């Protein structure tokens, strides 16, 4: 199935799986999704992920979700920049999520990274989504 917005699809799959207390969820594979998942893993929002190659040539990413005391670690995950309305931020205007308790994930010229990494690298970019 073709999707017009792979980031929104990924976010929705994660949110829906956590509402149903699933331990794993799968999504079609792509480099962009892997980069986003790498940021979520390094920030401690997911346990991990693995790419699975099928005999048909398609790849799929299996995401292992993270829970703490039976509650999902991700309380809120919300898309900011959408295909119809892109949202960009310079280093000075990078949003803080819940007073710094959450993160914004950005697509920058130096790759996909969390907001604090973008501040350290002194780059701005497209604000893909926020996580708390």
Swiss-Prot record:
SUPFAM superfamilies: Ribosomal protein S8. Coiled coil: none annotated. One of its GO terms (cellular component) is cytosolic small ribosomal subunit. One of its GO terms (biological process) is translation. InterPro entries: Ribosomal_uS8 (IPR000630), Ribosomal_uS8_CS (IPR047863), Ribosomal_uS8_sf (IPR035987). One of the primary rRNA binding proteins, it binds directly to 16S rRNA central domain where it helps coordinate assembly of the platform of the 30S subunit. Part of the 30S ribosomal subunit. Contacts proteins S5 and S12. Belongs to the universal ribosomal protein uS8 family. This is Small ribosomal subunit protein uS8.
